[in-house]
Amino acid sequence: MKSDFSDVRGFNYQLSTGSTSLENWLYYDPTIYELELRRGKEYFPGWNTIRLWLSWDAYFRRPAVFKERFESMVSIADRLGLKTIACLFNRWHDVSGFDNGGVYLDNFLFPQAWAYYVPLYESYVSDVVGAHGGDERIVLWDICNEPWPYNEFTEPIMGVWQAEFDWLTRMHKALKAAAPDTPVCVSVHNYLGLDGLRWVDPISDAFSIHPYYMCTSDNLYDPKRRAKYDQHIREYVEYARSVGKPLLATETCWGAETDEERAEIIRFTLETLTKYNLGFIPHALHYGATADLHTDDDSFMGETYLPFINKDGSLRAGHEVYNNY
């Protein structure tokens, strides 16, 4: 794999069975895991990277079992020709209320809080990452998925911002002590823009962005909206180049309920990203019980509908457009 990650052709993946990352780790089934990854390789032969969402709370329930399951996941992926990007923490919390779990303010904001877990998080990072120091199957450690999950940054929020950055910095230090040679990133969400890259620059070897072309049926083809998205990507690329760090899209390809509209979102998004020579990891490979990956048949839908593969294992119509890029 190229050091700039430009050849990454990936997918985010969560097991289809659990409604949170915790459930997927507690009730991990390697047979289902391999089946769903094999489906992905069948439909997308050029797929070469999987982004796995780890679960710190599953680790603390049974550390040895968690590490065995992580090794199983990485090993199965490797047999199928997939490198792994391992995401250690999650700060994305779905606006619909269908929460995936992860890290909350009490976990890092005040040492006096009962649920202040920063020292525990350090031991989790040291143990899990340390067990894979120098592991060439893991190409990138993603410290956290979408930190600073806020729509705007008012004065009260900026007080939280510093505590969150301090926590991320401690996780970076623990990670680098455990695996100094594996690149590290922090996956920032759309709303942060270039500020997000500036904020995580001190704790990143590579930049990890989530450039979703967020649209509806009414504005999917809006030329001004598309031009703004292109400009958005160009600014990311120029900033990353200015500081000499690689740039990778670890989530992308906004969802839609209709297959036709989703396929067009995929086409436009990947056409834009590859225009700037960026590797990409759409969200997400397979239908599942977690937020944004299922229809109303399996609970209420979240903000959008993002899987590439249907519940019955078939490919959503038109989603083979991925293979063009």
Language-model features, listed with the residues they occupy:
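Residue-level signal for short, function-critical loop segments
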Residues: W56, N190, H210-Y213, C253
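Active-site flanking residues adjacent to catalytic metal/cofactor-binding acidic residues
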Residues: W141, N145, I209, T250-E251
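Short, charged, surface-exposed secondary-structure boundary motifs
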Residues: S21, T216-L220
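Active-site mouth of glycoside hydrolases
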Residues: M1-S204, S242-V243, L273-T290, H294-Y305, ...
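Short, glycine/acidic-enriched loop or turn micro-motifs at the edges of active sites
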Residues: N145, P149, Y213, W254
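Short glycine-rich, flexible loops that bind phosphorylated cofactors or substrates
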Residues: Y59, C215-T216
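Substrate-binding and catalytic surfaces of secreted/luminal carbohydrate-active proteins
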Residues: P223-Y276
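His/Asp/Glu-enriched short active-site or ligand-binding loop at hydrolase and phosphoryl-transfer sites
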Residues: H210, T216-S217, I281-A284
